[in-house]
From Swiss-Prot:
Gene source species: Eremothecium gossypii (strain ATCC 10895 / CBS 109.51 / FGSC 9923 / NRRL Y-1056) (Yeast)
A molecular function GO annotation: GTP binding
Binding site for GTP: 75-82, 146-150, 200-203
Tagged with keyword Transferase: no
Function in brief: Mitochondrial GTPase that catalyzes the GTP-dependent ribosomal translocation step during translation elongation. During this step, the ribosome changes from the pre-translocational (PRE) to the post-translocational (POST) state as the newly formed A-site-bound peptidyl-tRNA and P-site-bound deacylated tRNA move to the P and E sites, respectively. Catalyzes the coordinated movement of the two tRNA molecules, the mRNA and conformational changes in the ribosome.
NCBIfam families linked to this entry: EF-G (TIGR00484), PRK12740.1-5 (NF009381), small_GTP (TIGR00231)
Protein name: Elongation factor G, mitochondrial
Length: 757
């Protein structure tokens, strides 16, 4: 036990204070920084509101909520998420046999139901299921969503975390925290999702769980501590020690379904006590009640430790770390117990909506089946019986045969069929209560739409949708396929907000955009398989941006006389660059009514339109503020069109005088390969003019992180395979836009000018 003086010195607090240590983290598209105080206050405010709402819940509501968990499984690619989920389904009795992701029986994992997923051994779409787990003489109901690990399918993680109350973060014991682990962590913070962490692949050579925990603390910047110690290492792994209860747990039976408990092996007793003390220390840093116990030099009880873990986990100040191996059928049942013990029930999570009928005032949703219905459509999918809409019920009940209203469109629709999903299978139900996840057919809506009973006009915030970073032209090989080609593109756009389609009037080509080469490759292949449309694709195109480097003023007059009423508009102001901004802003400072508000609104519209297609190379404009501070009107000839045209022309004129620059996407490239190929990978990255940021050397593999222009990355997968004998893998993630090289800028500008002639 730490001495009182040492603890106070470490916490740097007066004796009457209670400690609170939390490392703030960057999160969200705007990279806002959250301090420890603001994060803590946010949770305390949530807790206070939840306590106020609790009396509105009936005894049935509380019991229903207590036995319900909505959780997701997220991780870096190849960390074993789907294998983990397969074991969860097996141990909960949801499936009768275990099938591997790349199994020999050609069945594949249950949650990877698409043929492409089973062929490639990756998860492409998030898949939902439900199962039950018995603990402490209660049966707990889990709504479980398995999400992709590849960055190209990040929207699947976004929409899953948007509607979930908790998550299991799977980390590889060998590779530790990887690039997509950091991305998933950022997404969990964005939606305030607490998590328990499972260190998987403990049976692999080079497994080092305590190094992984250290990386969780430093790279993810969230306090973490082990609640398990492995029994045996690598291929000799046979179980784990529960350090809270000081008991050894062994998985036995053909598939690890039999749990045997016993005393802690003698050779592990010192390590168990060391890690138990570290767990209590870490909890004292983040939980007030545990800090008081610590400061009073008391030995915490098992229940006090568990309660502290639950409080700190739900408050998003801490993550308990469990260990095992999904492939070796070890440690999975312990994670199911941890989901019950440490992740929140729906009534412990504050969800809000905006009251559209009352100036979008924020209102708190009550997870009670006796209140008016409010639900969010978070995912669309084409099923055998039409469009399948996944809905999270936040308040009230959703009944088969009932009517619900789409708040965005105002349309009232009938719920003709209500189902619970089990991957690609479904089970019909008559009603779904508050806090649950279900799916329904026959509802015309978009992803992110809010539904109510019709009396309420509530709108819930949707998920974060990142910008596309890569585009390519696409056309059907046969004119006879044009109808199916159009159907496929419309469906894919509706299902996936990161998949965009546009028609380029200059080249007369259809352009598809997405999150990466694999993302678009999958959709082209799905079009061939699901719609029998073979396509030809052009060379991938990078989504560049345009900006300026210095301010510029404008004083532009638009005049047009054509015999009758003409057009007249004068606008004055300036353009200024906004550093590190992902948005454009339009502001006005016109005094004395020299430009009426209706004309200023037209100016704003002109600004928005010209920013969609910049004057330099025809790509979107980024990081510019346009200010209009003066102007003039004509009593007869001025109108909205004239001011819109004047604004567009003034923008183009001043933009070209403000040292315009082409920005290109810079990607974070993470390469993992056997150690003997490290020199080859460095040579390959140097050829791409990549800037190497970090290298981590493991027992057998190394992980190298670098930053590189997306423009140089096409074909990198082939080059990496050749350089590593097919043993290397990599991931790409968008980092930022930066000025392109002068040669590339000149080339792009010349190509654009030629295309305009």
């Amino acid at each position: 036990m730490l001495e009182r003086a040492a603890l106070l010195h470490r916490l740097r607090l007066p004796a009457h204070s209670l400690p609170f240590i939390y490392n703030g983290a960057l999160f969200g598209g705007a990279k806002r920084s959250f301090s420890a105080t603001s994060k803590r206050c946010t949770y305390e405010e949530e807790k206070a509101v939840l306590d106020e709402l609790k009396p509105q819940l009936t005894a049935d509501d509380l019991k229903h909520s207590k036995l319900l968990r909505n959780i997701g499984v997220s991780a870096h690619i190849d960390s074993g998420k789907t294998t983990f989920t397969e074991r969860v389904l097996y141990y909960t009795g949801r499936i009768k046999a275990i099938h591997e992701v790349r199994g020999r029986d050609s069945v594949g994992a249950k949650m990877d139901h698409m043929d492409l997923e089973r062929e490639k051994g990756i998860t492409i779409q998030s898949a939902a299921t439900y199962c039950s787990w018995d603990k402490d003489q209660e049966s707990y109901h889990f709504n479980l969503i398995d999400t992709p690990g590849h960055i190209d399918f990040t929207i699947e993680v976004e929409r899953a975390l948007r509607v979930l109350d908790g998550a299991v973060l799977v980390v590889c014991a060998v590779s530790g925290v990887q690039s997509q682990t950091v991305t998933v962590d950022r997404q969990m913070r964005r939606y305030n999702v607490p998590r328990v962490t499972f260190i998987n692949k403990m049976d692999r050579m080079g497994a080092d769980p305590f190094k992984a925990i250290q990386q969780i603390n430093t790279k993810l910047r969230i306090p973490a501590a082990a609640v398990h110690v492995p029994i045996g290492s690598e291929s000799d792994l046979c179980g784990v020690v529960d350090i809270i209860n000081r008991v050894a747990i062994y998985n036995e039976g053909e598939n690890g379904e039999v749990l045997r408990k016993g005393p802690v092996p003698e050779e592990l007793q010192d390590l168990v006590e060391e890690k138990r003390l570290l767990l209590v220390e870490t909890l004292a840093d983040v939980d007030d009640e545990m800090a008081e116990i610590f400061l009073d030099e008391q030995e915490p009880t098992v229940q006090q430790i568990k309660d502290a873990i639950r409080r700190a986990t739900i408050a998003r100040k801490f993550t308990p770390v469990l260990m095992g191996s999904a492939l070796a059928n070890t440690g999975i049942q312990n994670v199911l117990d941890a989901i019950v013990d440490y992740l929140p029930e729906p009534s412990e999570v504050l969800n809000t909506a905006l009251d559209v009928s009352n100036n979008e005032t924020k209102v708190n949703l009550i997870p009670s089946s006796h209140h008016p219905f409010v639900g969010l459509a978070f995912k669309l999918e084409e099923g055998n019986y039409g469009q399948l809409t996944y809905i999270r019920v936040y308040q009230g009940k959703l009944k088969k045969g009932g009517y619900i209203t789409n708040v965005r469109t105002g349309k009232k629709v009938k719920v003709s069929r209500l189902v619970r999903m089990h991957s690609n299978e479904m089970e019909d139900v008559n009603e779904i209560g508050a806090g649950e996840i279900c799916a329904t057919f026959g509802i015309d809506c978009s992803s992110g739409d809010t539904f109510t009973d019709g009396k309420l006009k509530y709108s819930m915030s949707s998920m974060y949708v990142p910008d596309a970073v890569i585009s390519l032209s696409i056309s059907p090989n046969s004119k006879d396929s044009a109808t199916n080609f159009s159907k496929a593109l419309n469906r894919f756009q509706k299902e996936d907000p990161t998949f965009r389609v546009r028609f380029d009037p200059e080249s007369k080509q259809t352009i598809i955009s997405g999150m990466g080469e694999l993302h678009l490759e999958i959709y082209v292949e799905r079009m061939r398989r699901e719609y029998n449309v073979a396509c030809t694709t052009g060379k991938p195109q990078v989504s560049y941006r345009e900006s300026i480097q210095i301010p510029a003023t404008f004083d532009y007059t638009h005049k047009k006389q054509s015999g009758g009423a003409g057009q007249y508009a004068r606008v004055m102001g300036n353009l200024t660059p906004v550093a590190n901004s992902s948005e454009n802003t339009f502001t006005t400072a016109v005094v004395g009514g020299r430009i009426p508000d209706k004309y200023l609104a037209a100016c704003a519209k002109g600004f928005e339109e010209v920013c969609e297609k910049g004057p330099l190379i025809g790509h979107k404009v980024l990081g510019i503020n346009m200010l209009i501070n003066d102007g003039a009107i004509h009593a007869v000839d001025s109108n909205e069109l004239a001011f819109k045209t004047a604004t567009t022309a003034a923008f183009v004129q001043s933009f070209m005088q403000a040292q315009p620059v082409v920005l290109e996407p810079i990607m974070t490239v993470t390469v993992t390969a056997p150690n003997e190929f490290q020199g080859n990978v460095i040579t390959l990255l140097n050829k791409l003019q990549a800037v190497i940021q970090d290298t981590e050397n493991g027992h057998d593999e190394f992980t190298m992180t670098s930053e590189c222009s997306l423009n140089t990355m096409f074909g990198f997968a082939t080059s990496l395979r050749a350089s590593t004998q097919g043993k290397g893998e990599f991931s790409l993630e968008f980092k930022q836009y930066s000025p392109a090289s002068p040669q590339l800028q000149k080339q792009l500008i010349e190509e654009y000018r030629k295309s305009k002639k």
